[in-house]
């Protein structure tokens, strides 16, 4: 049996969590029998105080770091894929794996791995509804770096779209819940047995298999949404696995018996399969389509699926007020509008320098003066007939009847 204290000391009114196998019991101290406080209880209360006071901000900082690393990794991986195309090797979209021999691609992969580790920690300390929308920062970083290092165009409207994405993410962070609803691996296992989540997971898995084996071979190279939707749907499983493993690590250092629980091993297998699938199809999308187009659309779909999964699995929105729910939804819609501006107007040549020279309607060119020919001016008509016949001798002669 494991014991964990939820308050700073074992005073009257303090709460005790008792764990026995997969069961949890919450007890309250109603009378002091001894003035001494066990050292073990003091240690756990210190951990609980750190989690309650600083856990949200630690998760927020790790999410910022993760966004920067992931946004930079896309550029490095794209440069590796471009170098692969220059050598004439089989492209990733055609089933080639030549990028595995490229140092630039591996640099991008390791950078992405570091970003995912930071993301891993962020999900362990903060709710998924907070961490996931901060991926908009990686959209901003990826779009800006691609314009400098990949020579991909990013006009004024695209930059404005990036700013709108960041503003929407800020609104979501302000209104998102700060308290986690699942704090132990036993609670995670109980949530995953819920009927609503099981139905949701089965629907995602079936749709993903249809996309991979039926739709992607036919339309994947022509439609950018196919590969991106596959990565986004798989992302729901990877985020749930990351969240569960993060909770497992925290519980391990808290002294809970997580090693004997089967769920961490199942989540590790799910994470390995989902990440490998995501990397494969994201490489195919980056190999064909523009980076500044792939990453924003991927962010919108990925965030939508993950937030929906978090609502169903972790029930993070159940304790939120109507104002916070409306603010979170408004922030997400703002992000979608920013992403739309980022890729819908990417081909327009608009910059700050060109704005003063743009006119609503160009000035009309002066109309030519009409030539007036009177009916009685027979000499002019005859001259026109002669000029027409001499300029194009191959044409058949035309007969004009002049009425006097």
From Swiss-Prot:
GO BP: magnesium ion transport
Organ and tissue specificity: Highly expressed in brain, lung, stomach, keratinocytes and leukocytes, and in all other tissues tested except liver, thyroid and fetal brain.
Q: Does the keyword DNA repair apply?
A: no
- Membrane topology note: Multi-pass membrane protein
Residue ranges annotated as Extracellular topological domain: 1-55, 124, 175-195, 245-261, 315-324
Pull one GO CC term from this UniProt entry: membrane
Q: Which Pfam families does the annotation name?
A: Mg_trans_NIPA (PF05653)
> Residue ranges, Cytoplasmic compartment?
77-102, 146-153, 217-223, 283-293, 346-404
Has keyword Cell membrane? yes
Tell me the GO molecular function terms: magnesium ion transmembrane transporter activity
Subcellular localization, as worded in the UniProt entry: Cell membrane
Q: What's its catalytic activity?
A: Mg(2+)(in) = Mg(2+)(out)
- Membrane-spanning segments: 56-76, 103-123, 125-145, 154-174, 196-216, 224-244, 262-282, 294-314, 325-345
Q: Which residues are glycosylated?
A: 7, 12, 40
Keywords from the named record:
Cell membrane, Disease variant, Glycoprotein, Ichthyosis, Ion transport, Magnesium, Membrane, Receptor, Transmembrane, Transmembrane helix, Transport
Q: Which InterPro entries match?
A: Mg_trans_NIPA
Return the similarity comment. Answer: Belongs to the NIPA family.
Q: What does this protein do?
A: Acts as a Mg(2+) transporter. Can also transport other divalent cations such as Ba(2+), Sr(2+) and Fe(2+) but to a much less extent than Mg(2+). May be a receptor for ligands (trioxilins A3 and B3) from the hepoxilin pathway.
Reported disease: Ichthyosis, congenital, autosomal recessive 6: A form of autosomal recessive congenital ichthyosis, a disorder of keratinization with abnormal differentiation and desquamation of the epidermis, resulting in abnormal skin scaling over the whole body. The main skin phenotypes are lamellar ichthyosis (LI) and non-bullous congenital ichthyosiform erythroderma (NCIE), although phenotypic overlap within the same patient or among patients from the same family can occur.
Return the protein name: Magnesium transporter NIPA4
Please name the source species.
Answer: Homo sapiens (Human)
